[in-house]
Amino acid sequence: MSNPILSWRRVRALCVKETRQIVRDPSSWLIAVVIPLLLLFIFGYGINLDSSKLRVGILLEQRSEAALDFTHTMTGSPYIDATISDNRQELIAKMQAGKIRGLVVIPVDFAEQMERANATAPIQVITDGSEPNTANFVQGYVEGIWQIWQMQRAEDNGQTFEPLIDVQTRYWFNPAAISQHFIIPGAVTIIMTVIGAILTSLVVAREWERGTMEALLSTEITRTELLLCKLIPYYFLGMLAMLLCMLVSVFILGVPYRGSLLILFFISSLFLLSTLGMGLLISTITRNQFNAAQVALNAAFLPSIMLSGFIFQIDSMPAVIRAVTYIIPARYFVSTLQSLFLAGNIPVVLVVNVLFLIASAVMFIGLTWLKTKRRLD
């Protein structure tokens, strides 16, 4: 009788064997449980793009009543940690040393300029351009404080201050503009990419190193059954890691979740199959655990960080690099998680990402199936 292409009896037996190996192997639990939580806490508490307290120097070249009043408004802001001095060289030295990130210069003719009709703002703001993000914060905060001070001054003088432009900002999807709320979904993607790739990158390589692959290939097992028994147990282990990441993100880190849990489960499964397939492909090619781990880290971690849109906007990349991002599964999972966490179920985003993730999973698992041979080389 011919050997069937797929026997679920053999698949079940091999999955039981693989599960027992996982239970007995502490490294699998370290990779699937400890490392995701550790990385998530590092991303959640260690990376913060919000500047809540900026160190700014105030150069007082004039100590008039108006200059001191504006300085008092600056120092009263909860966003400014001010260093006041009348010595320009001292403040410049502190800025060069990184002790302050910006410098507000109140010139010697500050009061006289303020008394003139239609006078322009007689202050100078110098920022540290080596950190553009912080420099933009300094500029924005100082401009905001300057406008508030002008309004208060006009009210005290019985006048009405009307700015030329009245900007009313609304932050959709992230009303408080908290950076962790979009960092954490991206961090979960990076973590699941690395975990999924590493978990399976060691599987086939370990079989070759221990000499058990020869025993497996000497049986009636088919390529499809071999791949299934390697994918199924690690799929459940990966979904456990995903569940832990979600619980920590929502209940400990406080990131809101507005999407469907069923959609999250479905898309997470597709993404995990892509990363597990990538790891299996690496393991099948290298046949060495050390080499497989190194290749998995480089093939999974670096592209998912650099080319997924997590840190750098894909639209701002050169056309050649943008083309490369289409084969990076993390690209589609980052936007999916950010959408589900912050905006909810947006079909125009989710449907496209699902299609690309299906194609990615089929590609990696298909390549692994082609590279898996039923003979010893």
Swiss-Prot record:
<feature type="transmembrane region" description="Helical">
    <location>
        <begin position="292"/>
        <end position="312"/>
    </location>
</feature>
<dbReference type="GO" id="GO:0090452">
    <property type="term" value="P:lithium ion transmembrane transport"/>
</dbReference>
<protein>
    <recommendedName>
        <fullName>Probable multidrug ABC transporter permease YbhS</fullName>
    </recommendedName>
</protein>
<keyword id="KW-0812">Transmembrane</keyword>
<feature type="topological domain" description="Periplasmic">
    <location>
        <begin position="256"/>
        <end position="261"/>
    </location>
</feature>
<dbReference type="Pfam" id="PF12698">
    <property type="entry name" value="ABC2_membrane_3"/>
</dbReference>
<keyword id="KW-1003">Cell membrane</keyword>
<feature type="topological domain" description="Cytoplasmic">
    <location>
        <begin position="367"/>
        <end position="377"/>
    </location>
</feature>
<feature type="topological domain" description="Cytoplasmic">
    <location>
        <begin position="203"/>
        <end position="234"/>
    </location>
</feature>
<dbReference type="GO" id="GO:0015904">
    <property type="term" value="P:tetracycline transmembrane transport"/>
</dbReference>
<feature type="domain" description="ABC transmembrane type-2">
    <location>
        <begin position="145"/>
        <end position="375"/>
    </location>
</feature>
<keyword id="KW-0997">Cell inner membrane</keyword>
<feature type="topological domain" description="Cytoplasmic">
    <location>
        <begin position="283"/>
        <end position="291"/>
    </location>
</feature>
<dbReference type="GO" id="GO:0015562">
    <property type="term" value="F:efflux transmembrane transporter activity"/>
</dbReference>
<comment type="function">
    <text>Part of the ABC transporter complex YbhFSR that could be involved in efflux of cefoperazone. Probably involved in the translocation of the substrate across the membrane.</text>
</comment>
<feature type="topological domain" description="Periplasmic">
    <location>
        <begin position="50"/>
        <end position="181"/>
    </location>
</feature>
<feature type="transmembrane region" description="Helical">
    <location>
        <begin position="235"/>
        <end position="255"/>
    </location>
</feature>
<comment type="similarity">
    <text>Belongs to the ABC-2 integral membrane protein family.</text>
</comment>
<feature type="topological domain" description="Cytoplasmic">
    <location>
        <begin position="1"/>
        <end position="28"/>
    </location>
</feature>
<dbReference type="GO" id="GO:0055052">
    <property type="term" value="C:ATP-binding cassette (ABC) transporter complex, substrate-binding subunit-containing"/>
</dbReference>
<comment type="subunit">
    <text>The complex is probably composed of two ATP-binding proteins (YbhF) and two transmembrane proteins (YbhR and YbhS).</text>
</comment>
<feature type="transmembrane region" description="Helical">
    <location>
        <begin position="262"/>
        <end position="282"/>
    </location>
</feature>
<dbReference type="InterPro" id="IPR051449">
    <property type="entry name" value="ABC-2_transporter_component"/>
</dbReference>
<feature type="transmembrane region" description="Helical">
    <location>
        <begin position="29"/>
        <end position="49"/>
    </location>
</feature>
<dbReference type="GO" id="GO:0035725">
    <property type="term" value="P:sodium ion transmembrane transport"/>
</dbReference>
<dbReference type="GO" id="GO:0005886">
    <property type="term" value="C:plasma membrane"/>
</dbReference>
<dbReference type="InterPro" id="IPR013525">
    <property type="entry name" value="ABC2_TM"/>
</dbReference>
<feature type="transmembrane region" description="Helical">
    <location>
        <begin position="346"/>
        <end position="366"/>
    </location>
</feature>
<keyword id="KW-0813">Transport</keyword>
<dbReference type="GO" id="GO:0006855">
    <property type="term" value="P:xenobiotic transmembrane transport"/>
</dbReference>
<feature type="transmembrane region" description="Helical">
    <location>
        <begin position="182"/>
        <end position="202"/>
    </location>
</feature>
<keyword id="KW-1133">Transmembrane helix</keyword>
<feature type="topological domain" description="Periplasmic">
    <location>
        <begin position="313"/>
        <end position="345"/>
    </location>
</feature>
<dbReference type="GO" id="GO:0140359">
    <property type="term" value="F:ABC-type transporter activity"/>
</dbReference>
<dbReference type="InterPro" id="IPR047817">
    <property type="entry name" value="ABC2_TM_bact-type"/>
</dbReference>
<keyword id="KW-0472">Membrane</keyword>
<dbReference type="GO" id="GO:1990961">
    <property type="term" value="P:xenobiotic detoxification by transmembrane export across the plasma membrane"/>
</dbReference>
